[in-house]
Swiss-Prot record:
Keywords: ATP-binding, Cytoplasm, Kinase, Nucleotide-binding, Transferase
Gene Ontology cellular-component annotations: cytoplasm
Protein name, UniProt field: Cytidylate kinase
Organism (species): Brucella melitensis biotype 1 (strain ATCC 23456 / CCUG 17765 / NCTC 10094 / 16M)
Entries under InterPro entries matching the protein: Cytidylate_kin, Cytidylate_kinase_dom, P-loop_NTPase
GO terms under biological process: pyrimidine nucleotide metabolic process
Keyword Repeat: no
Coiled-coil residue windows: none
Pfam families given in the database record: Cytidylate_kin (PF02224)
Gene: cmk
Known catalytic reactions: CMP + ATP = CDP + ADP; dCMP + ATP = dCDP + ADP
EC class name: transferase
């Protein structure tokens, strides 16, 4: 009897900051009972490890060591969501050696499981280019800034909308123009513009695509 290995069913959700990809990824993971990895947290976790030890953020060797020893299952989103950690993460995320180490860890996470949902910026193009289904979630900068602004207020913190919008545009430019793994949709990704969509509408649109991919995957 011929045996064969079924490839893991990987759902990829890429997109710029505050596009709604994380919210959508968590909803999809819950609906299908799939493990979820927010790959953006891996860069934040590396930055936090350096900050906690009082180490410089511009030392690629130290940052890479932190990346190689990272436990993906021990990341605390609530702690890692702090603004200061996000700022620090943007500095280590541009380091090629750090990116290579984290990409390998993210890839291992996806390939070691029967199914999973990963969201980030380069999952469909770099981490899991052979994923069964790829979504690229986007929205206008103004809509994304409003979402981020509302998130900050909901946490009880203060925020300046104009400052958030400027930061988002700056991050978009940095992400799209970086030499290593620039932010762009994979050629076979399904584009999902959530500028005028509710979370429920975005989920239903994604679910339709995923259900179709699942049916094909199962043959």
């Amino acid at each position: 009897m011929k045996s064969f290995v079924v490839a893991p069913f990987i759902v990829v959700i890429d997109g710029p900051a505050a596009s709604g990809k994380g919210t959508l990824a968590r909803r999809i993971a819950t609906h299908y009972g799939m493990p979820h990895l927010d790959t953006g947290l891996t860069y934040r976790a590396v930055a936090k490890a350096l900050l906690d030890k009082g180490l410089p953020l511009d030392d690629e060797a130290l940052a890479t060591d932190a990346a190689l020893s990272l436990d993906l299952l021990a990341m605390d989103k609530a702690v890692l969501s702090a603004h200061a950690i996000g700022e620090a993460a943007s500095k280590v995320a541009v380091m090629p050696a750090v990116r290579r180490a984290l990409v390998e860890a993210q890839r291992h996470f996806a390939n070691a499981l029967p199914s999973s949902v990963l969201d980030g910026r380069d999952i469909g193009t770099v981490v899991c280019p052979d994923a069964a289904i790829k979504l690229f979630v986007t929205a206008s900068p103004e809509v994304r800034a409003r979402r981020r602004f509302d998130e900050v207020l909901a946490r009880g913190d203060t925020a300046d909308f104009a400052e958030i919008l400027a930061d988002l545009k700056k991050r978009d430019e940095r992400d799209m123009n970086r030499t290593d793994s620039p932010l762009r949709p994979a050629e076979d990704a399904h584009l999902l513009d959530t500028s005028e969509m509710s979370i429920e509408a975005a989920f239903l649109a994604a679910k339709k695509l995923i259900d179709h991919a699942l049916a094909q995957h199962r043959g």
